[in-house]
Amino acid sequence: MGEAAAVVAVNGERYEAVGVDPSMTLLEFLRTRTPFRGPKLGCGEGGCGACAVVVSKYDAAADEVTSFSASSCLTLLGSLHHCAVTTSEGIGNSRDGFHPVQRRLAGFHASQCGFCTPGMCVSIFSALANADRAASAAPPPPPTPPGFSRLTAADAERAVSGNLCRCTGYRPILDACKSFAADVDLEDLGLNSFWKKGERADITKLPAYSCTADVATFPEFLKSEIRSSGGAPAVAVTGDGCWFHPRSIEEFHRLFECNLFDEMSVKIVASNTGSGVYKDQDLHDKYINISQIPELSAINRSSNGIEIGAAVSISKAIEILRSDGGDAVVFRKIAYHLGKVASPFVRNTATIGGNIIMAQRMSFPSDIATVLLAAGSTVTIQQVASKRMCLTLEEFLKQPPCDSRTLLISISIPDWCSYDGITFETFRAAPRPFGNAVSYVNSAFLARSSLDAASGSHLIEDVRLAFGAFGSEHAIRASKVEEFLKGKLVSASVILEAVRLLKGVVSPAEGTTHPEYRVSLAVSYLFRFLSSLANGLDDKPENANNVPNGSCTTNGTTNGSAESTVDSFDLPIKSRQEMVFSDEYKPVGKPIKKVGAELQASGEAVYVDDIPAPKDCLYGAFIYSTHPHAHIKGVNFRSSLASQKVITVITAKDIPTGGENVGSCFPMLGDEALFADPVAEFAGQNIGVVIAETQKYAYMAARQAVIEYNTENLQPPILTVEDAVQHNSYFQVPPFLQPKPIGDFNQAMSEADHKIIDGEVKLGSQYYFYMETQTALAFPDEDNCITVYCSAQMPEVTQDIVARCLGVPFHNVRIITRRVGGGFGGKAMKATHVATACAVAAFKLRRPVRMYLDRKTDMIMAGGRHPMKAKYSVGFKSDGKITALHLDLKINAGISPEFSPAIPYAIVGALKKYSWGALAFDIKVCKTNVSSKSAMRAPGDAQGSFIAEAIVEHVASTLSVATNTIRRKNLHDLESLKVFFGDSAAGEASTSSYSLVIIFDRLASTPEYQRRAAMVEQFNGSSRWKKRGISCVPITYSVTLRPSPGKVSILNDGSIAVEVGGVEIGQGLWTKVKQMTAFALGQLCDDGGEGLLDNVRVIQADTLSMIQGGWTAGSTTSETSCEAVRKSCAALVERLKPIKEKAGTLPWKSFIAQASMASVKLTEHAYWTPDPTFTSYMNYGAATSEVEVDVLTGATTILRSDLVYDCGQSLNPAVDLGQVEGAFVQGVGFFTNEEYATNADGLVIHDGTWTYKIPTVDTIPKQFNVELINTARHHSRVLSSKASGEPPLLLASSVHCAMREAIRAARREFAAVGGGTGGSDQVTSFQMDVPATMPAVKELCGLDVVERYLESFSATTA
């Protein structure tokens, strides 16, 4: 057997992987052994798409190249010998020219923080290439119009279905995708920089695309090597281990017969995508790549069915089932269902066999196993030194878990075309309809039946019922139910009995989340299937086309999460944007594209972890406590290959003499320790930092850590607000942060006609899910100095903490932040821990140290949004006017105060959007043994605004009036606004500036709204199993202006460098600052400054260059940074005016050259502070959302959302629009799907993309309309602008409120059949907490609605 290293081509360049770790992934190789940093580590699970690349393989025999997208974080380098890889830089770049995909992403304003954009670019590019390739392989299709691809608009939406973005809300990304689709109406595309609003959309104005331009070409040199080498070597030596590439099953078996391997040291791989689910706990030194065995990739078609080799990818299997399946409905529906498994770039490499092996060996909740089980599939396996066996899939799944010596060879799916009366359906319930989410339950049913002419129902002759993912070891057949149904004529009573039997079969194992919900789902799916075989079972046919709504129509199921393969849920995304542009301050006010957007799309934009590792760099990973309250007695490591890579562990004892054990500090509110010492006070607290030679070794060694705990003499942990109340465990709120009550509550309550006492609502936490996890790189320097590059929203505070921890003066510490890959508050105080830990390690070891947290550690340590429990008592008149409100609120702050004492003020501020008459509250900030909660986008305001809506809806249901009536009745007038908001409302001198009432009436008090509400009611009257709701929610949001520095320097060539205290985190700060600089210096230019835009560069934040930088938080940093820059420019203009007057008309460059020759100072620094009489102002908006809820599954589709937001005189409407849409969709996640779960010790267990589900392209509104209105000018605001970053998040509660209306309709429907929802009051008034996940919605609709309906139907027809 020969020996060789893997050879790959990356963007056309040859690389030989010599001396690399055999477990090295392609992503690690790209980022450490090549100059290409476009692929990012977002999750390490194949769940986000940030690492996507295009892989190309060459078949020398056929002289054919195949290309596909893949997750480089899962793909092992050793499996890519003689492959070509194309990254986002290879698609296009600043030197060779940007690709149309990159330019369109930039032009459609589809990149904000930019961390996800290279992966988006690769996914779109791959989809375009695949569509063009498929079209060329088929019979000659009609030519596409010039500039378009073969991609359809529907396929374009799916192209990025596996890619996550936390910033944009996806709408502009989808527009960029669909701009390539031949069937798109260009007029439907949103705001872009290619044609102005109102101009005719024209394909010729888009960056030209040609499907003949194949970027991902396969290098000729690699083809030559492949032809001459004959393929991959049998053995490849890589660093500390070996890769084996057997060419036959016999060769595979011989490897084991020679006793070279044991179960622990060897890993068998075909694609390695399983490591995204089941992480390697240790390193392996031997890998066997079975993908080179031809028999495992074979596909055989016969009259009996299709035999698919175990190493065939899921994508290839889908293609075969669609094309070779002919008229076989079973094959087509299996293919459709498989398209919901994982994401495109995972399906392209993940194998059918690997998925089934994981289901058999590791109890993986496989969709594929369930679907193939119902289809009657068989498998062929072979063990070492044994004969081949053909087993039914059911037999195989029931066997003891396979070992590494058992090889799954193929899967055979029978062809059912020769049978008459076959009905086959598959179902799955998951938070995302396009896939990329594990099912709560999946099921597949196949029945052979005949129609009974007399009854019109079907007689079941044979049936197969398969269920999976409900909490069992593997997919199962419901044999008892099958036996019962055989020979039965399908009727309500038969289905009812089948359902009762099923509930005894589908039994989730102990510890399974939402067990009752999963059983209910199984019942719902069996009901759906069997009711299609019964005649006259439902007198309300599910046909939404009969009842159109204001946004879209649909056929069958429209929910985005639980679908039958024959249902149409994927309505196209449509949108509309309305805004007013102004030329008064041009280029300020223009919707110019984001600075550096093309660089972000190409992957050339540099984030902290993209900085090349310096010589002798070490890497760190946190070891954290899994116990909520315990003494740390010691840290040891399991004996393993990973633990051998440990260099040292940095703990509290390594803090320099004179330094403090401090990891974060919020000014005036308190510190949090960097290291647990000597007691860990919460699960997830940092105990130490493992230092190793590579980041991967550090990660794996940290997993091998064994912590010795001792709980003697310690009180039990306080984990909940209830525990905190019992132990009187609270943080004090400083007087200056305490909200003030309004009016006399007791007096106002006595005037009420009606009272609600002790209403309750709970809100969970939310994780930031910035795409770039916490990261830092520390360089030790001379004289006890240190430089730290970190991803931080507060570089100045980070400098403070690092200096305190090291015990050095502040001027010894330099913090540099160029750009941040998403923040949302999570890169404020939480970023300081990583930066400080890096600094301590680098200071101690005198070597550079880098840390980039893996997603799980980041999620466990991050803290997130504050969970809370609210109780309220409210009094109101019979006409709906509220007279008094008392709020009793318990906030879970975690172990340290951090930002938490400021949360009550924010909650009450948002609550005050309504005039409550008298307002009183008792708010406790609870100290608990969980990770400290921190500021997250709209901290406190998001919760307060929602609590207000919950109260108003409770009042409305009590009075049996429309909720909008109560909302409108209790909106402020100018007088009450000033009573409730005081100084924040000082600028609202007239109704034109207090725009909330106008906005609300524009949405909710119009004939159009009444028409839509009537259509919703009509739909609900004609649809039993789907219900719609519509709701309009107003918001107010007070923001605070803070001092901000700015520095403008004009260089001798006329280029301009600008520094500001704010950090670019995706909010468009650099773009607005660039526009403001051009405007403010425009007085010196003949064209008014627009020509200066290309001369301006905003440079990175540097705490030794720009002091008093402050915080990038609170939504006002962009405008205050702009004002500081305007002030600097004003001084420069005054200084340069005499030169300009003498010089007359001159080009900018010549003019500046003259000024320089005249020794004019060409730099100016300003520190802007707000007017003491105007330090805050109000923001207003409203949103109407319409949703559809599937009563059987709890799945929700947002049919339409209309947002109107008062942006003042927008500094950049495109940027502000992106902020509004992104905030709204992030809010949708908080209010609906993002379930933040912990174990009994408070340790976060929803700690990755597999368990924590942020919104994706398939969960945003199907019709997404946004209008930015420009209200009256105000001289105290920056060019009359307003904030846009945080306030729009509150509008997402309109989705939750609409869901409540739909659920209320369902409860009314099924109250008539008895049981389940209690009395009439409970039907309309019910507690609906946050988030309203699928299980929560289904429970509120009724877990037993199927049984109740069947019982009622059977009784009425008996």
Curated annotation (Swiss-Prot):
Region (Disordered), start-end ranges: 540-567
Transmembrane segments: none
Binding positions for [2Fe-2S] cluster per the UniProt entry: 43, 48, 51, 73
Keyword line: 2Fe-2S, Abscisic acid biosynthesis, Auxin biosynthesis, FAD, Flavoprotein, Iron, Iron-sulfur, Metal-binding, Molybdenum, NAD, Oxidoreductase
Keyword Metal-binding assigned: yes
A single MF term (Gene Ontology): aldehyde oxidase activity
2Fe-2S ferredoxin-type domain: residues covered: 4-91
Biased composition (Low complexity): 549-561
Quaternary state and interactors: Aldehyde oxidases (AO) are homodimers and heterodimers of AO subunits.
Classification via PANTHER family: ALDEHYDE OXIDASE 1-RELATED, XANTHINE DEHYDROGENASE
Protein name: Probable aldehyde oxidase 1
Species whose genome carries this gene: Oryza sativa subsp. japonica (Rice)
Organism placement in taxonomy: Eukaryota, Viridiplantae, Streptophyta, Embryophyta, Tracheophyta
